[in-house]
């Protein structure tokens, strides 16, 4: 069968054609639900505010294997820079182009196709298969996976293993899987001063001048050494804003946004304590608020990682490399429940970019990998 005609290719194209920019779903989950319902899944839509979510499950017993992912995509950017319209899926030289091709409608299609094949071969499989799908992963992530997990936890419905379809691969399909993620902590700091005329600095109090030594010291601090699974904790200033835009006005306040990506060697509480101790040492007048974006998690050796290694080796012929690098994913909301979480998806070279694309052959291989993982865990 030509790669263009693979069922996974056709389903990916159907999903790409739905312009589901966050928090819109545009019928993607309905399309998936129709396919899953036909093979015995119970479909439970969960709509919270502007976000569409779906919890689908086949089986009533444990262990529970869950495919997790998102139907929403980031905006297209300048459409004139695309080779083809971003929501008109187009195959050129073996690559399928379209917004969401790699992140992550190709993965969603591969999950559905793999599950259809697995159920056809193993209708009486062990345990349960589930899908946790949201339309709010690329956005504020308030009403998506975290709300679904809250609902499941309230009724004591547990996930044993979760496979997130984020584009984990770097150079070729399956060369990297993500078996953990760093924690993410954001600080929003306001340093207070007194606004005034630049010609009369004795009548004002410049918060930029006051904050500069603090920020310099903060940016040079050593937080930890990392460990065998995580790099050292990193600190980055993301935004600074102060002043009125006029050259003759000393600002009355300085706003600074910064972010930590932290390892399991520290906790959010430790980072907060160190920052606030330094603020007090510099005798700054300040307000600060914190946003907890996610705790660090790690899935070590065990059934899920073992099954994934076997699947990638069997389908591609090479060994995968588990890593914890990169940004956060919705896995951070699933892991605190006790579930083991891994991420396996397409090559991430074009995600969020103009002309996002995925290799058509990789979609079929990804579906095969997912199918082998199901066989390893539920047969």
From Swiss-Prot:
Q: What SUPFAM superfamilies is this protein classified in?
A: Bacterial exopeptidase dimerisation domain, Zn-dependent exopeptidases
Enzyme Commission number(s)? 3.5.1.18
Question: Quick one: which residues bind Zn(2+) 1?
Answer: 70, 103, 166
Give me any GO biological process, just one: lysine biosynthetic process via diaminopimelate
The record ties this protein, via InterPro entries, to: ArgE/DapE_CS, Bact_exopeptidase_dim_dom, DapE_proteobac, Peptidase_M20, Peptidase_M20_dimer, Peptidase_M20A
Q: Which residues form the active site?
A: 72, 137 (proton acceptor)
Which keywords belong to this entry?
Answer: Amino-acid biosynthesis, Cobalt, Diaminopimelate biosynthesis, Hydrolase, Lysine biosynthesis, Metal-binding, Zinc
Instruction: Enumerate the CDD domains for this protein.
Output: M20_DapE_proteobac (cd03891)
Which note does the record give on the cofactor? Binds 2 Zn(2+) or Co(2+) ions per subunit.
Record-listed Zn(2+) 2 binding positions? 103, 138, 352
- From the UniProt record, list the reaction(s) this protein catalyses: N-succinyl-(2S,6S)-2,6-diaminopimelate + H2O = (2S,6S)-2,6-diaminopimelate + succinate
What is the stated purpose of this protein? Catalyzes the hydrolysis of N-succinyl-L,L-diaminopimelic acid (SDAP), forming succinate and LL-2,6-diaminopimelate (DAP), an intermediate involved in the bacterial biosynthesis of lysine and meso-diaminopimelic acid, an essential component of bacterial cell walls.
Family to which this protein belongs = Belongs to the peptidase M20A family. DapE subfamily.
Assembly and interaction partners: Homodimer.
Protein name in UniProt:
Succinyl-diaminopimelate desuccinylase
Question: Which species is this record about?
Answer: Shewanella baltica (strain OS223)
Q: What is the lineage of its organism?
A: Bacteria, Pseudomonadati, Pseudomonadota, Gammaproteobacteria, Alteromonadales
């Amino acid at each position: 069968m030509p790669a263009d005609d693979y069922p996974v290719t056709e389903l990916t194209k159907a999903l790409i054609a739905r312009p589901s920019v966050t928090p819109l779903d545009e019928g993607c989950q309905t399309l998936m639900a129709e396919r899953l319902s036909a093979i015995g899944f119970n479909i439970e839509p969960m709509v919270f505010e502007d976000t569409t979510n779906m919890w689908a499950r086949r089986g009533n017993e444990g262990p529970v294997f869950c495919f997790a992912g998102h139907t929403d995509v980031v905006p297209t950017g300048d459409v004139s820079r695309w080779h083809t319209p971003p929501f008109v899926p187009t195959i050129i030289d073996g690559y399928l182009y379209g917004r969401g091709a790699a992140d992550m409608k190709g993965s969603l299609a591969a999950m559905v196709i793999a599950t259809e094949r697995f159920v056809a071969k193993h209708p009486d499989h062990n345990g349960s298969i589930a899908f946790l799908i949201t339309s709010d992963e690329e956005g504020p992530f308030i009403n998506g996976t975290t709300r679904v997990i809250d609902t499941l936890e309230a009724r004591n419905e547990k996930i044993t293993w979760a496979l997130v379809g984020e584009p984990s691969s770097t150079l070729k399909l399956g060369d990297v899987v993500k078996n953990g993620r760093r924690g993410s902590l954001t600080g929003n700091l306001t340093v207070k001063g007194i606004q005034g005329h630049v010609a009369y600095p004795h009548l004002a109090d410049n918060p930029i001048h006051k904050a500069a030594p603090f920020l310099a010291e903060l940016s040079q601090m050593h937080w930890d050494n990392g460990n065998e699974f995580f790099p050292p904790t990193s600190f980055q200033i993301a935004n600074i804003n102060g002043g009125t835009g006029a050259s003759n006005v000393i600002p009355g306040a300085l706003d600074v946004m910064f972010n930590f990506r932290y390892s399991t060697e520290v906790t959010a509480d430790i980072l907060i304590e160190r920052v606030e101790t330094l603020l007090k040492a510099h005798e700054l007048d300040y307000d600060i608020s914190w946003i907890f974006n996610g705790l660090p998690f790690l899935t070590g050796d065990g059934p899920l990682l073992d099954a994934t290694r076997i699947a990638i080796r069997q389908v591609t012929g090479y060994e995968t490399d588990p890593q914890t690098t990169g940004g956060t994913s919705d896995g951070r909301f699933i892991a605190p429940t006790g579930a083991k979480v891994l991420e396996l998806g397409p090559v991430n070279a074009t995600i969020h970019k103009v002309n996002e694309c995925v290799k058509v052959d990789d979609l079929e291989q990804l579906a095969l990998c997912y199918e082998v993982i199901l066989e390893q865990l539920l047969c």
